[in-house]
Design a protein with these regions (language model features):
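Compact mixed alphabeta submodule
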Residues: 115-163
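C-terminal accessory/connector segments of nucleic-acid motor ATPases
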Residues: 1-9
């Protein structure tokens, strides 16, 4: 079985959604990137949750139930909101909370906006992250600790997205 170490992605590098999903094996089950509607993908082949975050959301691109407040708390800590139906007692919520104990991984990718002057904006892999704490349900507000500090420009963009 492949592991996270076998995934051909580099921390702090930029990738399209299609490249990310192919690299983590999400598309190997006959799924196509266009069928992924939400910003989370559970990849059982590598025991990894992939979180795709857009920092600056607009009413034209996102519904009221997907206007999640995702932002950096510090260069090492990231505040992320789960899907609007996820509770801390659900299997998905429990997977987030107990990922280290259960031997699963979380990969956090961010981009500033959905599009840029060239089309779809790429995501930057902030890297593996560990659960710190959470508050609430539907959505869960989770704090993740990055294994490596995020680049300064991403930290500043993330802070600006909530200002």
């Amino acid at each position: 079985m492949p592991s996270l170490a076998d995934v051909p992605l580099a921390v702090h590098a930029s990738y399209s959604r299609e490249e990310i999903l192919a690299a983590v094996g999400w598309t190997s089950k006959g799924r196509t990137p266009s069928t992924m509607r939400e910003g989370v993908a559970w990849c059982p082949d590598i025991n990894t949750d992939v979180l795709l975050v857009t920092l600056k959301k607009t009413d034209t691109d996102y519904s009221p139930t997907t206007m999640y407040r995702d932002f950096a708390l510090s260069p090492e800590l990231f505040h992320w909101e789960s899907q609007s139906t996820t509770t801390s007692s659900s299997p998905t919520g429990q997977r987030y909370i107990n990922h280290r104990r259960n031997g699963t991984n979380v990969l956090l990718f961010v981009r500033e906006a959905k599009t840029n002057s060239l089309g779809a904006s790429p995501y930057v892999l902030l890297g593996p992250a560990d659960y710190v704490t959470h508050e609430g349900d539907r959505p869960m507000a989770v704090t993740w600790r990055l294994h490596r500090s995020m680049p300064t420009e991403i930290y500043l963009a993330s802070r600006a997205a909530v200002a």
